[in-house]
From Swiss-Prot:
Residues 3-81 form the Carrier domain. Acyl carrier protein involved in meromycolate extension. Pfam families: PP-binding (PF00550). This is Meromycolate extension acyl carrier protein. InterPro entries: ACP, ACP-like_sf, Meromycolate-ACP, PP-bd_ACP. Belongs to the acyl carrier protein (ACP) family. GO terms for molecular function: acyl binding; acyl carrier activity. Signal peptide: none annotated. One of its GO terms (cellular component) is membrane. It comes from the Bacteria. It is found in: Cytoplasm. It comes from Mycolicibacterium smegmatis (strain ATCC 700084 / mc(2)155) (Mycobacterium smegmatis).
């Protein structure tokens, strides 16, 4: 089962807090990673890696550059999960077991 928008935002908020120290309440769909949350490119790569692990998706570098807001990432994850739900579910289960 694919994650809901709210679940993805909550998961991203946890990752962003861990990587940058930004409060989860600041992470909302309309927020820009650079302009609003002041996240640099190195932190963005770390967020992407952890997001890939958590949601069982692969975010190529060329796609990462186009993901400017939290909402962009949510939509991207949902699209990838819809395209390959079995792989996403298996990786999410593995990630949950590792917690």
């Amino acid at each position: 089962m694919a994650a809901t928008q709210e679940e993805i935002i909550a998961g991203l908020a946890e990752i962003i807090e861990e990587v940058t120290g930004i409060e989860p309440s600041e992470v909302t769909p309309e927020k820009s990673f650079v302009d609003d949350l002041d996240i640099d490119s190195l932190s963005m790569v770390e967020i992407a890696v952890q997001t890939e692990d958590k949601y069982g998706v692969k975010i190529p570098d060329e796609d990462l550059a186009g993901l400017r807001t939290v909402g962009d990432v949510v939509a991207y994850i949902q699209k990838l999960e819809e395209e390959n739900p079995e792989a996403a579910a298996a990786l999410r289960e593995k990630f949950a077991a590792d917690q």
